[in-house]
Amino acid sequence: LSMGRDIGHKNTSNKNYFLDEEATTLDCQQSSSNRYSQTNSEYEVGRLTAIDLLDDSQKAALQTNAMTNLVPQSKVMNRYGAWKRTETLVECYRDDINKPLGMDVLSGVLIGSDINNDHFTISHSLMSTPDYMWKLVYFKSENRYDAWIIKNSSNSLGSNLKSYRKP
């Protein structure tokens, strides 16, 4: 996702999650748009692409509610943990008028071998819960990046973000 200055101020409070019709046709997504907390209260809906990154367009922002962009994420990590901190940093980068324009923001999941967190096999047809999430922010004009790999855990606190940074 290529980003420029943050000029959007659309309401991004919508939490109407939905299945992506094309992905459903291809059988490439989870089977339910229900909240993960209904199955396990330690998890909630986590966005790979944050809704506020697209707040210059209501339509684009709401597309982040597609289940193809959502994964079970530790509630702590999502609300005030390390993942939330990366989202805040990206917003700060976009608001910094001294920074040159243009950055790419990429994110994804890493599925490991931890079967103890695979709570959504029946409820959402997810074979595995992501063990880690990653984010990369590439600053085009500076030819540099920030990158993090963060364990999908309630122990992944924002105050520890430096320890998740990758060279």
Give residue ranges: language-model regions.
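An anion-binding catalytic pocket shared by soluble metabolic enzymes
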Residues: 1-17
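Domain-level detector of nuclease and nuclease-like folds
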Residues: 16, 23-167
